[in-house]
Amino acid sequence: MAFFKKVACFTDIHFGLKGNSRVHNDDCEAFVIWFIEQARAEGCETCIFLGDWHHHRSATNVSTMNYTVSNMERLGAAFEKVYVIMGNHDLYYRDKREINSMEYIRNIPNIHIVNEWLVADDVAIIPWVVEDEWKKIEKMKQKYVFGHFELPYFKMNAMVEMPDVGGIQTDHFAGCGKVFSGHFHKRQIMKNVTYMGNAFPHNYADAWD
């Protein structure tokens, strides 16, 4: 049985941005409602969120937590399966995944937190890569890969390119089919890797990206 029939994805919504602004969180909620409407119209039964649901790593505001619960419940009711990838902003530490800010949504029906590599059939769903995990990627042959990757030579914004600091590279995915990633907010494609871009512009740096 296929891992999914038709999937809808979004990424980098950053609930809690702008000092846990209610205006921003309302914008996020409006996007989720719109996204569900579009996904239903296209017949998507599965949702994959590609990381950075929250903005603040070290603390989650109570108001923002309430937005998270209500919108995760909304997604869980709309899809048969919702996979929520842990991005770097969802993790307390940048270099390990032992603590994340999303555990309290784990028991919402149809919600699946992806805090460890999930490989099934021809699909891989990968959280923020830590330590030397990237070395496993070259051996992968999955048709579809979803993750929150920090790949060199992609644009971090319209002006600044991610430098090559060693480690994970775009060419490591050469054995895979299509790769879809969150993290960089500018929508862009290089080889078989697509950065989807954030859900909507969060500031002037994101405008028209």
Show where each model-derived region lies:
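A structural signal for the main folded, soluble domain(s) of proteins
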Residues: 2-6, 33-34, 131-133, 145, ...
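Active-site-proximal beta-strand elements of phosphoester/diester hydrolases
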Residues: 5-17, 121-130, 144-148, 194-197
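Core catalytic region of metal-dependent phosphoesterases/phosphodiesterases
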Residues: 6, 13, 17-118, 172-176
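Hydrophobic/aromatic beta-strand patches that form the interior of the parallel beta-sheet core
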Residues: 8, 48, 83, 114, ...
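Active-site glycine-centered loops adjacent to acidic/histidine catalytic or metal-binding residues
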Residues: 12, 51-52, 87-88, 148, ...
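Conserved protein kinase catalytic core
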Residues: 15-18, 58, 93, 133, ...
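Binuclear metal-dependent hydrolase catalytic cores centered on His/Asp/Glu-rich metal-binding motifs
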Residues: 117-171
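Conserved beta-sheet core of the metallophosphoesterase superfamily
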Residues: 151, 157-209
